[in-house]
């Protein structure tokens, strides 16, 4: 009977250790996780908001490229070509409007010199007529700029609305439970406050500033310049306060939440390792799984930053082209025409500069939020 028991034990031993088993490598784990994350909503949001995307990249393609090849997986040449093509396209689009403004101003400067010798009253009336026409052109162009800025911020918040839940899920899978909750709340808070600020503070504030600048230069003496400077200072102060608050909250959460997550995950790993017989195997599998999820999480963060750059390029380049053209037109017209015309066009350039600052700060808020949470949770227990 003894030899029968030994034979049965030997058969069981050989059956357990020699039976073919499926073994998953790190790549298999990451492929399986990528399928479970379901990035379709983020891909749809990106396709909806990004026009003329280089090489037809999707968000999931970018994540897979970062996972497989790192930064070498993204073609820098295609992105650079996209930027240059977009920049020169915007220059060609805004050129006719500024040719009209410069032509009207030069013609007024020429005929104004003739009219001033006849009658000062006729000269002033002709200035009001020409200034009204130029002011209408400037307001028309600035309304287009406002729509571009509002649309650009809207596309950014739309993408972030689709990205935040997916990224929070990835944080949760990587063992960063507290960090996932803090990121979810902070990021959606930024989206909500930014939408309200654009609707009730920044867009109306810049509109009032531009109107005050144009009305101020309607008179020979400055009457509304200090009021316009007050609005300009208020907008810049709101941007600085918002950036400081978000950075402060992000830094505090990046210090506390990841430490809490590290403590809880470390305790879990140590508990698995304490199990006799299979503890080390469970601990090794857990570390492999955690490393895969962190790799996917960081790749998603890098892809999101790249998408934010692409989303911000189009509106930023459009506003930048208008800003450069306004400043250039003001510099060209200053030696020939009335000082008030040149100063009013320069004031429009300052309004474009405020819009550039608003868009830069909006992108920077999301950049800092994603970067801080990705860097602070990029550890393997």
Q: What kind of feature is each model-predicted range?
A:
Residues 1-104, 109-127, 143-156, 160, ...:
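Gly/Ser-rich, low-complexity
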Residues 99-110, 130-138, 164-175, 203-214, ...:
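Hydrophobic alpha-helical transmembrane segments of multi-pass integral membrane proteins
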Residues 116-120, 219-235, 333-342:
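Membrane interface segments of multi-pass transport proteins and intramembrane proteases
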Residues 125-136, 156-164, 193-199, 230-244, ...:
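Small-residue-enriched core segments of transmembrane alpha-helices in multipass membrane transport
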Residues 159-166, 170, 331-335, 339:
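Extended, low-complexity, charged alpha-helical tracts
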Residues 184-248:
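Loop-centered beta-sheet repeat module
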Residues 298-339:
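Helical hairpin unit composed of two closely spaced alpha helices linked by a short loop
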Residues 336-356:
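Interfacial loop-to-transmembrane junctions
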